[in-house]
Amino acid sequence: MINVSIAGIGGQGSVLAAKILAQAAEAKGWQVRTAETIGMAQRGGNVMSHVRMGNRGEVVHSPLPAKGSVDMIIALEPGEGARALPFLKKDGVLVVPKSGIAPTAVNPKAAEYDPQLLIEEMINKGIHVV
């Protein structure tokens, strides 16, 4: 079983990316379940998409992964990567960009964070950041 979560801000394409990943896995014969948590996405809020893939013969019962069970989080924005960390397993991988997009439509003060500092903090906590 492989669990991948894609975290981003509304409009970045996290739902589309999850659909593409799911279709690719299905084309290879994997059983796939997907789920999205969209919230205030239309206003620049967070979006979390989950793709759970079972190799041939492996049954995927639930579309939502348990916290601490995701193999890889693909973050389209560093702050959303940090928000998704409770889902990442201990030996999981976080893929995160070096620059951020502040969702100022929701919270004007959100622009006041340093993405590089946030990434350094995650690395210092032992998170495998790519």
Label each residue range with its predicted role.
Residues M1-V130:
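Active-site cofactor/cluster-binding pocket
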